Amino acid sequence: MSVHQIRKHAVLPPIICRSDKEFLESVQRYIITETERLGCSEEGPADEYYIIYRNVFDKVIEHITAYKSILTSIKKEYDAFIETIKKDRRTTFCLHGKLKGLAAEPTALVYYRKRTIQLEAKMRIIESNSSKIQSQIDHIKQCRAEYDTKEVKYCTFSKDPSKPIPGMTLQESMNLDALTKYMKHLEDKYAEIKQAMLIKYVPAQRKADLDEEMIVLLKRRDVAENLNKKLQFCHQRLQIISQALSSWVKSDMSSPFQDFVEQIQKTKYLQGDQGIVEELMEDDPRRAKEAEIMLHYIERFNELISLGEYEKAACYAANSPRRILRNIGTMNTFKAVGKIRGKPLPLLLFFEALFITSHAFPCPVDAALTLEGIKCGLSEKRLDLVTNWVTQERLTFSEEAGDVICDYGEQDTYNKAKCLALAQIVYSECGLHKKAILCLCKQGQTHRVMEYIQQLKDFTTDDLLQLLMSCPQVELIQCLTKELNEKQPSLSFGLAILHLFSADMKKVGIKLLQEINKGGIDAVESLMINDSFCSIEKWQEVANICSQNGFDKLSNDITSILRSQAAVTEISEEDDAVNLMEHVFW
């Protein structure tokens, strides 16, 4: 057979086996199915076609065994080709964007130049207006300076001379003598007003100087009063001794002089009240004048109240001599007035004047007026005034005043922290340390709470537990149960846990257990060793609580520490006969 004949027979297509045919059909179905599933058209996205045919390539390579290496190399070239196309496409997109940017640069430059011209024109307008305004300001200043230097001439000026002169009839205005007389009257009135301006009005600085001078004089008065009391006491003692000596000399001098003095002194004590009454009823001109001044002061105060000048009346009452109007009765007078539309509350004006002048008197404002003043200020939403009163003025605080401030803080949540700070000051001044510490806890000032507790010697464990019930904070409990400055903890951790779980505060107790659980067994052991208040039975209860609430590891740690501590026996130094190895030989 020739070569030509062999080539003729080789032209026939190869016979495909059944398995290959089924494989080709499955591949064809896979391509059609995936194309329809992805919604690819004939001109669809190349990435999705690439994924489909890459998977087909993988299936063909897995199916064919004879040409696997050739097909693998073809697939690699195919992947490299597709990757090159993608890279070129990204490069084209980036270059296209840069080209657009370069093409838009001339237009942007034109817009920027145009905007620069507009802004420069606006700046020129603003500078021009500023220079005009500055020139006007300089002109006004110059005119004001000239006006201040010149003497002001007061002269009557009538825009319409045809109108009648006020206070004169038409016939009198035409009479020269009447006009001369009226002009003399106006000149006298002008001189009187000018003199009144010099006498009745003083600069504000003069008032400040007088206030300082008044404070100095009040201090001198207090010193003089104290000295006067001491001298009166010395005079009374000398008078008793003098009377006793004269009586003892007149007597037979049989009894000792010291016993005689004591007997006369007792007689003086029994007759003391009568002496005081006689002293008050003594006809002293100075005291009569003082009573007259006080009576006039009260009448003037009532007159101001009737005229509706409540601000002046408040200042008048606050500066009353011997504090005769600084009392509850005066407060009730202002309270009865009530609110006036468009004007400040008269009662608030009274308390402002009362508290501001508290430093001018030797005794502070009493507790009742302090409480009413704080209530009045808070009812008018004037927390700023109350803050100034509490921190700056001389007041007498009470527990009720602190409670009122705390209640206001609960209503006004925005100013709650400020109210708690003010209440803490009030409670501290009153010696109510428990409430003061509670205010600090509510503010979150844990370190100040610890310092406060350390300063108090009579703060017991029950007080601490009550504090935790009022303000259950994890940070506070941790500070109370830790050593501070090498001192024992203020509170037992075990007792705190038991108290929290018994008082339906399970959430706080669980948070506390979570924090302790983070420290591991070393932290638990240190906590238990330093806790000298909690017994073994109590710690066993704590372990049971841990186990019931899902803290099994913490429960096991506590139990193991308890067992290890139970196995330890302390040997005293005096017991020298103890044989430590005795159990080995027995």
Curated annotation (Swiss-Prot):
The keyword Coiled coil applies. Keywords: Coiled coil. Residues 174-232 form a coiled coil. Signal peptide: none annotated. The keyword Coiled coil applies. InterPro entries: ARM-type_fold, Clathrin_H-chain_linker, CLHC1, TSNAXIP1_N. This is Clathrin heavy chain linker domain-containing protein 1.
